Amino acid sequence: MEKSNRRKRPSTPHLSCELCRERKIKCDKVDPCNNCVSAGVVCIPVHRPRLPRGVHARRARPMSPTFVPPRAPTPVAGPVPSEKKQTDHSSGAVAAVDDDLRRRVHRLEAVVNSMRAAMQDSSPATVKQVSCEYWGIVGRADEEKSVLNDSYPAPTSSLACNASIPMTVQGQPPFESRPDCFWNNMVGEIEHFGGDVGSSSETKSDDHSSLAPNMPRMGDGGLRFLGLSGNNPTLTWTPVLEGKEMTRQLCQIYLQQVDPIIKILHRPTVEKWMLHGERYLDYPERHVAVDALRSAICYATAASLTDDQCSAIFQRSRSSGIVEDFRRECETALERSGFLVSPSITGLQAFVLYLIARRSEDRGQAAWTLTAVAVRLAKALGLHRERDETFFNQQMRRRLWLTISLMDLQASFSQASEPLISTEEATSTFFLPKHINDSDLDPTMTHEIPDREGLCDTTFALVTYHIQLAGRALNFGTTASPQHKASQQQHAQRFEENALRLLHFCDPESSPYAWFTWHGTQCLVSGARLSALRPLQLPQPSNGSSQPPSSPSPRPQEHNHELLRLALNVLEKAHLMHTDPRGEGFRWYVTMPWHALAVAINECSLSPDVVRIQSAWPTIEACYQLLRRKGVAGQEEAIQRPLEKLICQARDKASPLLQLARSSPTFSLGSSTGTSAAPTPRSRASSTPSDTLSDLSWPTAFSHAPSQLGMELAPVGPVQPFAKLDLDSLLSQFDIQGQPLLAGQIPPVDAELSLRTWEQLMSDIDAESNQLLP
């Protein structure tokens, strides 16, 4: 009787293997099949009853994958052992559940393979092996897991398949009627795993993820999807940081050329960490966030290096791609830190340094796009809100938030867009840090200290913090009106007073930092006065109209000579910082102010004064050539084309007067040469108050530069009671304030024509920006 029953029960058929089924190719149904042997992968045979077809097909009741009976593992080669007999009911249920699982795991496999392909040590064979391991885990459940762990072990970096996938498959509750419940749970497990890897909390010591920074991992925080790594996802470059000595050299340059400008790190703490080998704050050794900060410091330093410094340190020229190598290494460290998943102050500081260096290296839209990420992370960390914390943490959080606010404003100007942080929000979150030296601060300090008098580590940083506040109020306010104009004057006057108060009795000859702070601040103040007369206002529709709002009539004192004088002041200062040897360490930061250049060109093309054009044109040509050599990209092309058209028109008019060869303009700026060599006064007190206080427009000073400026620190001196200061009493031959032209000897230019020409230029820039949109 038993033998007859065995004869009636047919053996389980041998169907196409898993790989052939997925590839939709014919399988010879041997073990292993020839297709899998040729591909060099593990063949996963399928032994089950054939699924019913036609009217006999019916969907089995959904069941939990924990009820899937295990199958015996099949070796890579050799005979297939005899299978266990299964009932028709259990076979049909298992088949239905297998199909449901495979559809979901196939989607999971595609995601995992795409992540694995982006890792450093990825290879096609390894990806195929992981793919087959996933199918084996789903098809054979518990017993297959142990065999795969023993036979085909995967490294820790290969997404920890053996740890995460079986846990998900076995720990699932019974399936619900919703078909994507299993997939959603799988995605939740992956996100949870990525969050653990990317943890960078300052109070938590990570024993496994943070102590292996050189190991590829999937907790990259999604930076690859943001395009940080460009078109090379495998990241197969040679590391640049080969030794501690090179890191020390870069740190020393950072403290001289970057740290006085970008005051988001504590200088003594960085010195103890990178120069003396001590731990960084309370972080464990080789923490991923600390490694990201180290790479960001080196990248920012590389972006600030001159050609001579590159040759001395790396025996390579700057044009050989040394900065790009540091950028890729910084991107890899940021990806490993996972700061998008679990943000921290240290990780955000590294990201801000990366954006500042990226902005100085690349004028495209990458830094503009990623600035939004920095703003969101800062708000996620609560940097825009005041908290009850230690004095040290309070100061560092304020510096970081105001630096990000400044970056947001700079990015909006460079791409002709509104900032993410509104004027109201910037005003309500404006909590100024103390005007002190970094040596006055200590991480263990709990009590507050008063502001210092004189030049400090944070002097220029505080000037730029005032700029980001005034720039929003002046350029992104309400429509033009008498009330708005008065409010702009108040904003401009407040900025000028705050900025110049910080520089009282600053000795610009005492150090490069003092020299650069002196001239940089005066360039900003000149740009503020210029913006009061010619604000950067791109035409925008108003009240549903497609026409730009009409500008108010110019005031009587708004004449050609004042505009040209202020524009030349800005250009003279910017050119001085580009040519004077004392500004060499900060040249990476300064860009040519296209706004002031456009105003100067426009006013020269309308001015009837031959003497004034002859004195101003060499400065204009020199600055225009500097702007062209810097190059533009992305939305900045919209500025370059109308500016080129404007200067061609001005050359046509100026050539008969200056005998200027339009085809090959030369730089014969004798006065500027004298300016570079002339000493700067030691006292800035002035008895000549200025009537024209301006609304500050940030791009008039450093149109697309990152935040602060400075270098080696000057000694501290006392501050006298504030008196109204002149821009610069030694603004060389181009300081035409004292010339009789302003006294009315030359009839002024038609202010209406000047204003219409300026509005036409802004309209052309807006039109070019729209053409660049995809």
Swiss-Prot record:
InterPro entries assigned to the protein according to its UniProt record, in alphabetical order: Sec_Metabolite_Reg, Transcription_factor_dom_fun, Zn2-C6_fun-type_DNA-bd_sf, Zn2Cys6_DnaBD
Entry annotated with the keyword tRNA-binding: no
Superkingdom: Eukaryota
Family annotation (Pfam families): Fungal_trans, Zn_clus
Biased composition (Pro residues): 67-78
Disulfide bonds: none
One cellular component term from this protein's GO annotations in UniProt: nucleus
Subcellular localization, as worded in the UniProt entry: Nucleus
Stretch list, region Disordered: 61-94, 536-559, 665-697
Keywords from the UniProt entry: DNA-binding, Metal-binding, Nucleus, Transcription, Transcription regulation, Zinc
Low complexity composition bias: residue spans: 536-548, 675-697
Keyword Nucleotide-binding: no
A GO molecular-function descriptor: DNA-binding transcription factor activity, RNA polymerase II-specific
Ranges of compositional bias, category Polar residues: 665-674
DNA-binding region of this protein: 17-43
GO BP, sorted A to Z: DNA-templated transcription; positive regulation of secondary metabolite biosynthetic process; secondary metabolite biosynthetic process
Protein role: Transcription factor that specifically regulates the neosartoricin biosynthesis gene cluster.
Name of protein: C6 finger domain transcription factor nscR
Gene expressing this chain: nscR
